[in-house]
Amino acid sequence: MDTDYEAVVYDLDGTLVHLAVDWAVVATDVIEVYDEAGVDARGADLWGLMERADDHGIASEVEAAISEHEHAGAHDSRRLPLADELLDRSVPVGVCSLNCERACRIALDSHDLAAAIEAVVGRDSVDTHKPDPEPLLATVSQLGVEPSEAVFVGDSPRDGTTAERAGVDFRRV
């Protein structure tokens, strides 16, 4: 793949590592933030709650609740086989994740991957998050290449949508 692209960008959780996060517990904690603000959060999923938090003036509290779990889960994360692939890259490598940037960096450090990564963009690094193209475009820009010169490697339909919207080739794992 190195000969086909000038840069490779990876998603983090589910692609390079598996964060030890119980997302159901995270959702419960986020719903508690909504409850404390007097906002009905019934029926919404975690990412919907995250997206609506700003509308209710609780974005920083919701982000803190999610990030706390991600930080702990990054320390206890499990390295996935694809992580070995990035260490052999001869082109610039970045990470673009829906996780917060600090959790990404913790996980990369925990698995001795940080030195191989030239750019890390998490959901809190830019104003929008995947599937908006902005985070991936920011990562590609930090790597010094054009979107058409990069490939995004991820594990979810959201990653594929992000790549398509950014004009970046996609490889699903």
Locate each region found by the language model.
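Glycine-rich phosphate-binding loop signature in dinucleotide/nucleotide-binding domains
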Residues: 2-3, 89-91, 143-146
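Short glycine/proline-centered loop/turn elements that form peptide/ligand docking sites
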Residues: 85, 156-159, 170
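Substrate-recognition "cap/lid" segment bordering the active-site pocket of phosphatases
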Residues: 100-151, 157-162
